[in-house]
């Protein structure tokens, strides 16, 4: 969910200082409500940094916006206004500033309009050794949902707790929830083919987006009011949710197959190897 990179240094020098960068944008949410969609976009980008082990208090943002031509229609003007207000509210709540951005306000061609779009990019510094990858690491570990409750007295309390556990070496993997717990668990299972079994007393909607929330694999059980135990990692490469089971390999094939025709990852068996030439003619004034 993030891009992590060491900071560049002079030759013969070394550093363990790195940066993590992530984005957030839900086109459906923005079309339904530009204010809430933009607010969620900011939170989604920062939540991914938190899931990677970064401190959200050190994050900065840059925003990219696309909107239809505004003309003289109040409803059209209201869309970017609402979106920017939502993004600003999120920044004030998080204490994270957007230090740059690009406004693309000409998203209209004849009678075609782009949907309201605000993409949040977040970046934060981190020690390279603290970067946390999202795939499940080991069978038999408890998996928790850290609930980012916008209505709580301390909305970022779950993020603070997760960071505390990470600093103590008790977090093995984490993923910021975007499209529901089922999608989250599936993606976390792919990397090491480690399965997941839902707990017997879990009563929640596995296919509803939970902005601000993070699913994490821990090394031990915890008792925290904003952490819900979802289940346990398993050695068997199978995901079991609500009595339904699916092999990880089948889910991975379906997941990768969506864009296989657009961006092929495998060459056909009879595909010839082409020889490419980069020779070009050199023209001079003579």
Regions found by a protein language model. Give the residues of each.
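A glycine-rich phosphate/pyrophosphate-binding beta-strand-loop-alpha-helix module
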Residues: 32-107
């Amino acid at each position: 969910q993030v891009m992590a990179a060491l900071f560049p240094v002079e030759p013969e020098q070394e550093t363990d200082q790195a940066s993590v960068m992530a984005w957030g944008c839900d086109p459906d949410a923005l079309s339904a409500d530009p204010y809430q969609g933009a607010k969620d976009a900011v939170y989604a980008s920062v939540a991914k940094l938190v899931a990677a082990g970064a401190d959200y208090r050190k994050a900065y943002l840059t925003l990219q916006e696309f909107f239809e031509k505004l003309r003289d229609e109040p409803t059209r003007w209201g869309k970017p206004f609402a979106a920017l207000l939502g993004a600003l509210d999120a920044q004030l709540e998080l204490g994270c500033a957007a230090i740059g951005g690009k406004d693309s306000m000409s998203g209209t061609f004849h009678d075609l309009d782009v949907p309201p779009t605000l993409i949040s990019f977040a970046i934060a510094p981190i020690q390279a050794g603290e970067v946390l990858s999202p795939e499940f690491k080991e069978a038999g570990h408890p998996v928790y949902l850290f609930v980012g409750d916008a209505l709580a007295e301390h909305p970022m309390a779950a993020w603070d707790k997760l960071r505390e556990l990470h600093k103590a070496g008790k977090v093995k993997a984490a993923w910021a929830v975007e499209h529901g717990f089922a999608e989250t668990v599936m993606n976390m299972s792919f990397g090491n083919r480690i399965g997941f079994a839902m707990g017997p007393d879990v009563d929640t909607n596995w296919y509803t987006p939970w902005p601000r929330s993070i699913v994490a694999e821990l090394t031990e059980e915890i008792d925290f009011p904003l952490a819900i135990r979802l289940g346990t990692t398993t050695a068997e490469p199978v995901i079991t949710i609500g009595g339904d089971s699916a092999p990880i390999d089948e889910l991975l094939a379906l997941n990768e197959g969506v864009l296989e025709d657009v961006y092929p990852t495998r060459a056909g068996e009879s595909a010839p190897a082409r020889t490419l030439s980069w020779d070009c003619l050199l023209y001079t004034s003579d």
